């Protein structure tokens, strides 16, 4: 079969591209190795729609996040949870950024930052500033249903699940992709596989993105009434976040120190657990960590202890469940904690574009390369 575009990956970036190109009349094929869309990073993350507060050491990342925040809210407001207080605080110890610097950063970025008394939320002496901000959380399952409804109305878009590409080759002015029982060709290939981006590059003999891989855990928590409508993020160092997880009624707990269980610096993700998973995962072919028989033990004892050290006792929370996923991070980002979206044209004819982004609302960066 011949298409205008073949898209690898049915996360947000893949389905956004499919919907946009399909609505323009293009014939699109999406290939997803999992049995359903949004099974990995689009679902398994903090679900934070970034306004930029997270990046006081990377003004460029903050500005881009703020720029796209309003557009994302307008386009996908139906999946957002907006009715809660999002509190950012700066730790009095071991933080790269203090309260005064955070205020200056927010003023420079033009984003809301209203002082609140740290002792309202935190134990004495632990935070030198606390701020009410404007930031929301999205519900990946609601967003997924919307995209599937949109794509179902486009007969020129086909999405195939449980179809992992096994071979990709250049044939004249097209890419030929084999996946499962199908062979498809298109003059345009979009690599939107996120943590699998270098797996595709390796198949084609292309240079890898310079990334490290973190095997990450998001802990879902039930919370006391006092926390139900509040999100807490303590900056800017080895701290934590506890905030609503979309519209699920649960909160996500993450920690800079304990959310990443292991890190791989190889060009394709390589971890000891791949020797213990019964062959379902290997370097160059990442399985879904959340479904893996070799997924790690929860870091709940460490994360919860850290959060309880900071939070006043009245803000209670309890373990519900854990979600695991692989997070690729550009090695260059280790210096300033930036999270640039990389959209790179790897080949002109036939066209191959690879995208890597750790933020939901910078999906619009794809617009400049989709050719619609």
Question: Model regions: which residues?
Answer:
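Glycine-rich FAD pyrophosphate-binding loop
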Residues: 22-43
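Central helical "cap/lid" subdomain
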Residues: 38, 182, 186-235, 245-250, ...
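Dinucleotide-binding Rossmann-like beta1-alpha1 core, especially the glycine-rich loop
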Residues: 46-129
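Helix-loop-beta segment of a Rossmann-like dinucleotide-binding subdomain
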Residues: 80-90, 116-154, 158, 176-177, ...
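Helical element adjacent to the flavin cofactor pocket in flavoenzyme catalytic cores
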Residues: 131-188, 192-202, 363-371
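Flavin-binding catalytic cores
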Residues: 260-327
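C-terminal catalytic lobe of FAD-dependent flavoproteins
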Residues: 301-372
């Amino acid at each position: 079969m011949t298409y205008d575009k073949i898209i690898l990956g049915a996360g947000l970036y893949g389905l956004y591209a499919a919907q946009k190109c399909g609505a323009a009349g293009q014939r699109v094929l999406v290939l997803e190795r999992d049995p359903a869309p949004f099974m990995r990073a689009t679902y398994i993350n903090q679900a934070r729609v970034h306004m930029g507060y997270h990046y006081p050491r990377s003004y460029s990342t903050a500005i881009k996040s703020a720029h796209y925040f309003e557009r994302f809210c307008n386009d996908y407001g139906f999946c957002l949870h907006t009715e809660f207080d999002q509190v950012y605080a700066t730790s009095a110890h071991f933080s790269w950024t203090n309260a005064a610097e955070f205020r200056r950063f927010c003023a420079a970025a033009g984003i809301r930052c209203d002082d609140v008394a740290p002792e309202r939320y935190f134990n004495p002496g632990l935070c030198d500033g606390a701020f009410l901000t404007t930031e929301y959380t999205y519900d990946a399952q609601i967003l997924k249903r919307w995209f599937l409804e949109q794509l179902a109305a486009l007969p020129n878009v086909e999405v195939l699940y449980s179809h992992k590409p096994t071979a990709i080759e250049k044939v004249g002015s097209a890419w030929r992709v084999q996946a499962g029982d199908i062979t498809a060709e298109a003059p345009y290939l979009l690599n939107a596989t996120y943590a699998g981006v270098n797996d595709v590059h390796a198949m084609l003999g292309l240079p890898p993105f310079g990334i490290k891989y973190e095997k990450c855990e998001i802990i879902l928590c039930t919370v006391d009434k006092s926390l139900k409508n509040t999100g807490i993020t303590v900056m800017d160092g080895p701290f934590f976040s506890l905030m609503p997880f979309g519209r699920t009624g649960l909160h996500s707990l993450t920690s800079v120190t304990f959310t990443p269980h292991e890190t791989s610096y190889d060009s394709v993700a390589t971890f000891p657990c791949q020797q213990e998973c019964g062959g379902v995962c290997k370097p160059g072919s990442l399985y879904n960590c959340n479904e893996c028989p070799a997924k790690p033990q929860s870091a709940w004892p460490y994360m919860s202890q850290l959060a309880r050290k900071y939070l006043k006792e009245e803000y209670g929370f309890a373990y519900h469940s854990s979600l695991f996923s692989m997070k690729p991070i550009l090695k260059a980002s280790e210096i300033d904690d930036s999270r640039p979206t990389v959209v790179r044209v790897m080949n002109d004819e036939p066209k191959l574009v690879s995208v890597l982004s750790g933020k939901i609302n910078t999906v619009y960066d794809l617009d400049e390369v989709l050719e619609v």
